Amino acid sequence: MQNDAGEFVDLYVPRKCSASNRIIAAKDHASIQMNVAEVDRSTGRFNGQFKTYGICGAIRRMGESDDSILRLAKADGIVSKNF
């Protein structure tokens, strides 16, 4: 919900799983959120930006989280396509 100024005023904004696009429930204590830092290719230093991936507990329970994170990282260009 937004107020007249266009700011979000909700107390709880649900997250979505990056792999399955499911809403991560508030009581899903098995879910994770990980930030992968973007680095400068020439210097190898952190440039202040990162990619955020959220994985729900159901994906982790099936043992598919590592494949999902690798697939998402390849799509974002963090990992090379021929890895």
Swiss-Prot record:
Query: Which positions does the record annotate as the modified residue N6-acetyllysine?
Result: K81
Cell compartment(s), UniProt: Cytoplasm, Cytosol; Cytoplasm; Rough endoplasmic reticulum
Gene Ontology terms, cellular component aspect?
Answer: cytosolic small ribosomal subunit; rough endoplasmic reticulum
Primary localization: cytoplasm
Task: State the InterPro entries in the record.
Answer: Ribosomal_eS21, Ribosomal_eS21_CS, Ribosomal_eS21_sf
- Kindly list the GO molecular function terms attached to this UniProt entry: ribosome binding; structural constituent of ribosome
Record bears the keyword Acetylation: yes
KW Cell membrane (keyword) present = no
Alphabetic keyword roster: Acetylation, Cytoplasm, Endoplasmic reticulum, Ribonucleoprotein, Ribosomal protein
**Gene3D superfamilies attached here?**
3.30.1230.20
> What is any one GO biological process for this UniProt entry?
endonucleolytic cleavage to generate mature 3'-end of SSU-rRNA from (SSU-rRNA, 5.8S rRNA, LSU-rRNA)
Q: What does this protein do?
A: Component of the small ribosomal subunit. The ribosome is a large ribonucleoprotein complex responsible for the synthesis of proteins in the cell.
Q: Which PANTHER family does the protein's record reference?
A: 40S RIBOSOMAL PROTEIN S21 (PTHR10442)
Protein family per UniProt = Belongs to the eukaryotic ribosomal protein eS21 family.
Its quaternary structure? Answer: Component of the 40S small ribosomal subunit.
Q: What is this protein called?
A: Small ribosomal subunit protein eS21
Taxon lineage: Eukaryota, Metazoa, Chordata, Craniata, Vertebrata
